[in-house]
Design a protein with these regions (language model features):
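RNase H-like nuclease fold core
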Residues: 11, 15-64, 70-78, 150, ...
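N-terminal amphipathic/basic-hydrophobic helices that include classical n-h-c signal peptides
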Residues: 1-15
C-alpha cells in the first residue's frame, strides 16, 4: 500500500533533525473572516497547510497556524523552529508570559482555548520561536500569508467555536 505524501513527509522526520514551521494568520476585519497558513519544511520535504473560519480574529489565526502545524507532526520529541511575524505569539512564548497566564488560569486573557492547545504541543516537542517582520519579502512568510488570505476567502467557512471565550 502506497504511503500518502503527508505520511512520507512525517516518517522521514527524526528527533535528530530540525523541522522548520513557518506560519501566518490573517483576517478581514477583527472580527471577520480569517485564515491561517503554515508550511512545514524538513530537508527537501515541504507541506503546506491552511484553513479558515467565518468569524475570527487575526491573533486567533496566528495561533491556529502554529497549532495546526505542530499538530500535523506525528512523532513526539521533534526539534521545531517556528518562524512567525506575530509578536503576540512569539513574545508570549519567548518572554514567558504564556506560562504565567497558565498558572493564573488564563484569567482575563483572550484565546485561552488556543493557548491551552498550544501548551500541550509545546510540551510534546522541543520548540523554539523566531520572529520575522511581516510583509518584508521573507519568501516563506509571504507564502504563508498567501495561504492564510486565500483560506479566509473560501465560501461557507466553518464557525470558530472558540471565538468570544
Amino acid at each position: 500500500m502506497a504511503l500518502s505524501i503527508l505520511n512520507q513527509f512525517y516518517l522521514s522526520c527524526n528527533a535528530m533533525a530540525v523541522v522548520e514551521l513557518y506560519t501566518d494568520g490573517a483576517s478581514s476585519g477583527n472580527p471577520g473572516p480569517g485564515g491561517y497558513g503554515a508550511i512545514l519544511k524538513f530537508g527537501q520535504h515541504e507541506k503546506e497547510l491552511s484553513g479558515g473560519y467565518r468569524r475570527t480574529t487575526n491573533n486567533r489565526m496566528e495561533l491556529m497556524a502554529v497549532i495546526k502545524g505542530l499538530e500535523a507532526l506525528t512523532k513526539s520529541g521533534l526539534d521545531v523552529v517556528v518562524t512567525s511575524d506575530s509578536k503576540y505569539v512569539v513574545d508570549a512564548i519567548d518572554k514567558g508570559w504564556l506560562f504565567g497566564w497558565e498558572k493564573k488560569g488564563f484569567k482575563d486573557k483572550k484565546n485561552p482555548d488556543l493557548w491551552r492547545r498550544l501548551l500541550v504541543l509545546l510540551r510534546k516537542h522541543h520548540v523554539k520561536f523566531k520572529w520575522v517582520r511581516g510583509h518584508n519579502e521573507h519568501p516563506m512568510n509571504e507564502r504563508c500569508d498567501e495561504l492564510a488570505v486565500a483560506a479566509s476567502k473560501v465560501y461557507n467557512l466553518p464557525e470558530d467555536t472558540g471565538y468570544g471565550e
